[in-house]
């Protein structure tokens, strides 16, 4: 698209001074453009040896990145979906094509019925199916569906957030709860 529009960023305050949330001028200066999908930037094992690809959008990326670096996990790639609509088909095909033997996980911190999961689920599955990816379908890691966006207790929120990051990075896919089931935090 050759249309230039103002960018409106809606972000939690926790990202304003986060040490990982930085961009240099070369990434946003003249002759640059918005990237709908951002691939892996860290040095990991060879693409064909990546065990898991985590797709995510928003603040949870920084939680995943920070924990992956702390644990020194080098066989899990994190791909950011920066624009959900129109859906970035080409960008995701390109990124998922880099990791043909990896498990594919969608991770979000919002409850399943409030985040992007119900929008991206079938679209990501179509990509996996149409391009013969080894993963048959994308797995969900996040909070179960809920009537309220917040748990109401900071301690419970922290516990759930830790569980989400842990499951996304190293959880066994066959033991993950479905979005409508109650996970064991």
Task: Give each language-model segment a name.
Residues 24-33, 72-75, 116-132:
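A short, gly/pro- and small-residue-rich
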Residues 61, 65-100, 137:
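Generic long, charged, amphipathic alpha-helical segments
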Residues 50-52, 56-58, 64-65, 180-185:
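Charge-patterned, long linear interaction tracts outside catalytic cores
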Residues 2-6, 49-51, 73-75, 101-102, ...:
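Short coil/turn connectors at secondary-structure junctions
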Residues 85-104, 108-119, 153:
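Glycine-rich, anion-gripping cofactor-binding loops and their flanking helix/strand elements
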Residues 1-60:
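Active-site phosphate/pyrophosphate-binding segments
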Residues 1, 7-16, 108-185:
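Peripheral docking tails and interdomain loops at the edges
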Residues 18-24, 65-67, 91, 116-119, ...:
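Short acidic, glycine/serine/threonine-rich loops at helix termini
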